[in-house]
Amino acid sequence: MSQVVQTRRLQAVDLIKRKAEGRKIISLTAYHAHTAGIVDAYCDFVLVGDSLGMVMHGMESTLPVTLEMMILQAQAVMRGTSRALVVVDMPFGSYEASREQAFLNAARVLKETGAGAIKLEGGARFAETVAFLTERGVPVMGHIGLTPQSVNTMGGFKVQGHGAGDEDRLRADARAISDAGAFAIVLEGIVEPVARAIATDPAIRAATIGIGATAACDGQILVLEDMLGLSDRVPRFVKSYGSLRAHIEEAVRAYADEVQAGRFPAEGHTYPPR
């Protein structure tokens, strides 16, 4: 795939245009400037996900992630990118209490990072919050289905859509978020027929972004470390496009062996006298 030459950074409205044009939306997560710089050339938007708590810090869930952590990593991602829209997750506890709390924290994220949008989890019950934010100039990406911040109430990371009435509930969630002004909605961990019904619903104007959902979504997203083969455990929906963990282990092993044997540093890696 060739890199895209572009003079301005993509915005939320561009994802809606891609949906209208039938162009697939490509996304990956990033938490560092250097990885963000690599994916920037190929992604329409880069998500600074609260998954950084698990990927970077070894947390058991995303719940302990703070707003300060999100802002710090989003600043790094913004430095590493120049064309992709950067979307920042609102962490658990930063938007649920009230619409006003959500706006103050979302505004802080946008002001301190320069990112182009925020993402929050939840369906119809957060429609008023989405509307409150969008009316005040905050582009919002929604997130329904398997919502990791609800892991305790869901009883774990469980695929959604198996139960009676789940399709109607999830479709109502997507419609409510879309009607409230969300420019895109992540559909995560939803059984394929239900996800397809939502993704092809003409009443949903927002772009649908799948992760463990359906190819019928307007776009797809994966956690970068998962698709590169760096993570220890990955969900069923992840396809491995690399084996970075094995390559890193091989490189570290070679380094350790050379140091132990006295072969590193060699003459070419030291400074001779003038």
From Swiss-Prot:
Cofactor remark: Binds 1 Mg(2+) ion per subunit.
Cofactor: Mg(2+)
Known pathway: Cofactor biosynthesis; (R)-pantothenate biosynthesis; (R)-pantoate from 3-methyl-2-oxobutanoate: step 1/2
GO biological process, one term: pantothenate biosynthetic process
Keywords noted in UniProt: Cytoplasm, Magnesium, Metal-binding, Pantothenate biosynthesis, Transferase
Catalytic reactions on record: 3-methyl-2-oxobutanoate + (6R)-5,10-methylene-5,6,7,8-tetrahydrofolate + H2O = 2-dehydropantoate + (6S)-5,6,7,8-tetrahydrofolate
Binding site for Mg(2+): 50, 89, 121
Active-site residues, as the UniProt record annotates them: 188 (proton acceptor)
GO CC terms of this entry: cytoplasm
InterPro entries in UniProt: Pantoate_hydroxy_MeTrfase, Pyrv/PenolPyrv_kinase-like_dom, Pyrv_kinase-like_dom_sf
Enzyme Commission no: 2.1.2.11
Enzyme class per UniProt: transferase
Binding site for 3-methyl-2-oxobutanoate: 50-51, 89, 119
GO molecular function: 3-methyl-2-oxobutanoate hydroxymethyltransferase activity; magnesium ion binding
Top-rank taxon: Bacteria
Compartment(s): Cytoplasm
Free-text function comment from the UniProt entry: Catalyzes the reversible reaction in which hydroxymethyl group from 5,10-methylenetetrahydrofolate is transferred onto alpha-ketoisovalerate to form ketopantoate.
Assembly behavior: Homodecamer; pentamer of dimers.
Similarity remark: Belongs to the PanB family.
Protein name: 3-methyl-2-oxobutanoate hydroxymethyltransferase
Source organism (scientific name): Methylorubrum extorquens (strain PA1)
Name of the gene encoding the protein in the UniProt record: panB
